[in-house]
């Protein structure tokens, strides 16, 4: 191996910064890059010039959309940072970054505590077993309250928050931070950019409170660490090293979550947070090994971090860069890879050549000769690789577990302003869909209309905006449409018989299929229960294919039919006239016939909506929820406001942002995420069928 790795694996940290929108996540990342020497000038998000928000729309909207990957060094450790979006439409970006991280920093707004989107990203991080530390940011803000933030972690996330610091002052009087582990205080010079601070003994007026809090911290650690428990009960001294070891052990085991205080905007506490990343978050060696499948034998294999193993990596993001073209971001789980070498895309079974390898710093890039185990880098030259694909050594193919992406819930028709733009628009949409698996673009073969689908209105706005900026395609978009589905609600059996025997080669296919509703989300399940060859083996795949194709067009209003179990149990064939095509048609006829007795319904996406408004607007807002066919699931008082939890059909939520803004004089906010599908009321079902020129039988 020609190149030597700069940082050993145990001194590598792959972390994400996750938060609710506006908690100060991008500013926090920005400061990390500033203090680790990657940025010379600090850019403020609210001035629209942040280092990490590298797409033009992100700078305009002041929100982070694309997870940019950045590398920094701190105290002889390499820290790879993935900046994740806080807006609910982009939870797919959060999911995909969590998949490749080892640890995360959850940023809270110290005045608001845990907010709805914090809960969403926290739940996603828990699904992937990602250890976290929490940074209570904006301690300088009016109403900032560190203890309230800690309590909100216990109450709203049911997580064992461990405060390892205590702020000195708050709001305008936020002067510094006491480290409860080392019992030292960091006091900041008000005028400096936070690069100037002094570490002193805990000031006398804070000693008693700090001692009390340190004791509480040790008591909490004793609950999960026997060594601390014994020493604590025996009244023995517990060293700083022992406390740090216990915090690290508890954090890695997801038994506790250290909480720190600071103000990224005022440059306070970021360095101590970086120390905590190094001290408490895992290296690639600390996380449980990822599993992969050997495609030849089907055996499960554990991926062990180490440069001496065969190369295995996951492509977790594809982005188009204006200067170098298509970038594929990869996380290396084991082995090394040199630029110019070949890899096998085990997902697609294709060999690809890696032209160059880049380490990304926000939107700057540095070419590197080789990537090592545990690294995150971007590869140029991979033409067939898309998000979620496994890249491995051609001599040792391995299939990593792919990522699961949600289906889009909202769609709009999009049309180029001029006919000349049609081809350009098709290319742009294809590239954008490659980058973002939660976005789809399809052309209706009958009407020629192009429809784009995504996770929310903002998601699609940004896609249209990117078409204009990056691909110079001007497009107009129609009104948003809901992605409805159809389902059977009763068990039934039906025959599908397709016979054509007049002149020339005939056609003959005959099937009996039993249909029943499947559990929500289980999809289509096909069972072959043919006995005695009444339908020959070679035609059975055609029956399944015929059913799948017919389900795509539904039975009521042309929406996909979902969650159906189909059992092929009888039928007949003709020695000469039967063919795969005939059985395919017969299967679709069986589905149509079944629709008459299976009581089909139209399903609509139901969103989980959380609305936060000052108390005086509660009545009006509750009325709005009910008027939108919503059902209120609960309410709670949070930080001087009321939060309403409700389930509302997506079709009723279009344009709600404007309604809420005017009803609450701009003081209300809401988030919504897709929750489940449920049947629409009968009257609405009839309207939908009528509107679609429905073909209910």
From Swiss-Prot:
PROSITE patterns: G_TR_1 (PS00301), G_TR_2 (PS51722). Residues 10-285 form the tr-type G domain. GO terms for cellular component: cytoplasm. Keywords: Cytoplasm, Elongation factor, GTP-binding, Nucleotide-binding, Protein biosynthesis. Pfam families: EFG_C, EFG_III, EFG_IV, GTP_EFTU, GTP_EFTU_D2. SUPFAM superfamilies: EF-G C-terminal domain-like, P-loop containing nucleoside triphosphate hydrolases, Ribosomal protein S5 domain 2-like, Translation proteins. GTP binds at residues 19-26, 83-87, 137-140. InterPro entries: EFG_II, EFG_III, EFG_III/V, EFG_IV, EFG_V, EFG_V-like, EFTu-like_2, G_TR_CS. It comes from the Bacteria. It is found in: Cytoplasm. One of its GO terms (molecular function) is GTPase activity. Catalyzes the GTP-dependent ribosomal translocation step during translation elongation. During this step, the ribosome changes from the pre-translocational (PRE) to the post-translocational (POST) state as the newly formed A-site-bound peptidyl-tRNA and P-site-bound deacylated tRNA move to the P and E sites, respectively. Catalyzes the coordinated movement of the two tRNA molecules, the mRNA and conformational changes in the ribosome. This is Elongation factor G.
């Amino acid at each position: 191996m020609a190149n030597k790795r700069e940082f050993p694996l145990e001194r590598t940290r792959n972390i994400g910064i996750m938060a609710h929108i506006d908690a100060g996540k991008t500013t926090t990342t920005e400061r990390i890059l500033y203090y680790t020497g990657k940025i010379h000038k600090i850019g403020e998000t609210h001035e629209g010039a942040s280092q990490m928000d590298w797409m033009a729309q992100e700078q305009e909207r002041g929100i982070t959309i694309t997870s940019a990957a950045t590398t920094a060094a701190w105290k002889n450790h390499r820290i790879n940072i993935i900046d994740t979006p806080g807006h609910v439409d982009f939870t797919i970006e959060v999911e995909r970054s969590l998949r490749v991280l080892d640890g995360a920093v959850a940023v809270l707004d110290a005045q608001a505590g845990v907010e709805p989107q914090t809960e969403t990203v926290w739940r996603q991080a828990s699904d992937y077993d990602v250890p976290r530390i929490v940074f209570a940011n904006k301690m300088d803000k009016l109403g900032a309250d560190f203890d309230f933030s800690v309590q909100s972690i216990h109450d709203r996330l049911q997580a064992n928050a461990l405060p390892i610091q205590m702020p000195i002052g708050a709001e305008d009087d936020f002067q510094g931070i006491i480290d409860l582990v080392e019992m030292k205080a960091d006091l900041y010079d008000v005028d400096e950019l936070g690069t100037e601070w002094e570490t002193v003994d805990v000031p006398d007026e804070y000693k008693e409170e700090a001692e009390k809090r340190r004791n509480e911290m040790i008591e909490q650690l004793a609950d999960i660490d026997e060594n601390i428990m014994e020493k604590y009960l025996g009244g023995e001294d517990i060293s700083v090293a022992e406390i740090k070891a216990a915090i690290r052990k508890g954090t890695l085991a997801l038994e506790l979550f250290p909480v720190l205080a600071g103000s990224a905007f005022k440059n306070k506490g970021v360095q101590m947070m970086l120390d905590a990343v190094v001290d408490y978050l895992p290296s690639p060696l600390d996380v449980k090994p990822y599993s992969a499948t050997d495609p030849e034998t089907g055996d499960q294999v554990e991926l062990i971090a180490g440069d001496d193993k065969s190369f295995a990596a996951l492509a977790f993001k594809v982005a188009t860069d204006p200067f170098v073209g298509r970038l594929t971001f990869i996380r290396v789980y084991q082995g090394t890879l040199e630029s110019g070498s070949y890899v096998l895309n085990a997902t697609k079974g294709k060999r690809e050549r890696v032209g160059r390898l880049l380490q990304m710093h926000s939107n700057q890039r540095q070419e590197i000769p080789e990537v090592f185990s545990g690294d995150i880098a971007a590869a140029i030259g991979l033409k067939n690789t898309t998000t979620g694909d496994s890249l491995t050594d051609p001599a040792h193919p391995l299939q990593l577990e792919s990522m699961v992406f949600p289906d889009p819930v909202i769609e709009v028709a999009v049309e180029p302003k001029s006919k000349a733009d049609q081809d350009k628009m098709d290319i742009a949409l294809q590239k954008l869909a490659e980058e973002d698996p939660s976005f789809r673009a399809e052309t209706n073969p009958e009407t020629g209309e192009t429809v784009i689908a995504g996770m929310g209105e903002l998601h699609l706005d940004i896609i249209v905006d990117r078409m204009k900026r990056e691909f110079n395609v001007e497009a107009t978009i129609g009104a948003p449409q809901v992605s409805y589905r159809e389902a059977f609600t009763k068990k039934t059996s039906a025959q599908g018989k397709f016979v054509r025997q007049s002149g020339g080669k005939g056609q003959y296919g005959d099937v009996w299929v039993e249909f029943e509703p499947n559990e929500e989300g289980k999809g289509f399940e096909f069972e072959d229960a043919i006995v005695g060859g009444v339908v020959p083996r070679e035609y059975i795949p055609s029956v399944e294919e015929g059913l799948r194709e017919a389900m795509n067009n539904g039975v009521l209003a042309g929406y996909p039919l979902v969650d159906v179990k189909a059992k092929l149990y009888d039928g007949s064939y003709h020695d000469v006239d039967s063919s795969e095509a005939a059985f395919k048609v017969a299967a679709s006829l069986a589905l149509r016939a079944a629709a008459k007795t299976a009581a089909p319904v139209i399903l609509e996406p139901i969103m989980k909506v959380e609305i936060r408004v000052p108390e005086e607007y509660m009545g009006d807002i509750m009325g709005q929820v009910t008027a939108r066919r919503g059902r209120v699931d609960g309410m709670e008082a949070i930080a001087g406001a009321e939060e309403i939890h409700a389930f509302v059909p997506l079709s009723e939520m279009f344009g709600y942002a404007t309604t809420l803004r005017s009803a609450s004089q701009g003081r209300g906010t809401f988030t919504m995420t897709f929750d489940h599908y449920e049947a629409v009321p009968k009257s609405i079902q009839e309207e939908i069928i009528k509107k679609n020129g429905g073909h209910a039988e």
